[in-house]
């Protein structure tokens, strides 16, 4: 009996053969390596691969390097796994989004420059109108001076009459009221230091990060659609501003031609009045 007791006492239960043991009691059991080629990486690792996560690692940098040169160093696109191609598609989608957003920024800079040009043209039109209006005041003063010069002289002298080639008409063209209002509005915003165009508010908001490459591609496509929509709206604004500025420049060119005629007429009459005054002083 003692031999049997010693036999049962010396025999220890095997942990490796008990299927009900916990995973923590596996002891020195050999672990089988996981197959990385058939299982997609976790969400945080994929997020770092796309540049959206905080854990940007050397592996993600290496992946971006492969995507950047289109797998030229690793056998080309045809030799890549489905997982690599999914990451490549997400990378290209993100790259396209960045290019679209770059085009939008360039268009916004062009719109800001066009807004400043519109304000400058508006101020130039105001200056042309004010300067031409002054010819009417000069004409009134000159007419009184010519009348006094004609009354001066001896009793038997021939009465002097000023020579005129035409009438001083002043501004004949009326400026476009819509352009004046638009230019005045932009000018006031510039003085107040306000932005000419508020940022677009119709862009879609994404509250969660994508958990797969396909979701990343779809999100980037949505961003591209928003960017292209903004770009189309800005280009439409630029086209309208270009038409307005072209019409205003043509109107100002015609106004300058009319004002030049009045300036030449005033110059001719002033020369005649000066000649009359010198003759009176020489007597």
Swiss-Prot record:
Keyword Isomerase: no
Subcellular location per the Swiss-Prot or TrEMBL entry: Membrane
Keyword Transport: yes
Domain of life per record: Eukaryota
Coiled coil stretches, renumbered: none
Keywords tagged on the record: Membrane, Plant defense, Protein transport, Transport
Induction record: Induced by infection with the rice blast fungus Magnaporthe oryzae. Induced by hydrogen peroxide, osmotic stress and drought stress.
Additional notes on this entry: Plants overexpressing SNAP32 exhibit enhanced resistance to the fungal pathogen Magnaporthe oryzae. Plants silencing SNAP32 exhibit increased susceptibility to the fungal pathogen Magnaporthe oryzae.
Job of this protein: t-SNARE involved in diverse vesicle trafficking and membrane fusion processes. May be involved in resistance to the rice blast fungus Magnaporthe oryzae. May contribute to host resistance to rice blast through interaction with SYP121.
Protein name (database record): SNAP25 homologous protein SNAP32
Source organism per UniProt: Oryza sativa subsp. japonica (Rice)
Lineage: Eukaryota, Viridiplantae, Streptophyta, Embryophyta, Tracheophyta
Gene of this entry: SNAP32
